[in-house]
């Protein structure tokens, strides 16, 4: 389909390796705990800590926690994959062929971006549920919408942070 030197071929190959080596979707329980339960509890604990410390707007804490988890999730995934590739000797081969291979870095980022996006949507859902149960949903709706619109920017920030940290 693609030539081996083609940008899309390299991007697709790298993304496929990331997908096949990810254990997140190994079982339903693994996917639920990795993408929903643990991140949701993290946001909930941040909100409860903010309420305990008498923070004026716990929904803002939930949105900030959700967006920060997206950036850090993507960055951690990119760094972990680059470290694995460095250990296997793949990273040296890629850097020898091209000084900066955008296809490699985008392929490496594909799986962390997907996982962080799912986690971010879940976390913002937890923030919306908290706002709804707290009775301040109308006042927090604009903040939730702004947080959703910031998701692509946080994904790009996570990619950049991961590439520069790797």
Please place each PLM-identified region on the residue numbering.
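Hydrophobic transmembrane alpha-helices and immediately adjacent juxtamembrane helices
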Residues: 1-166
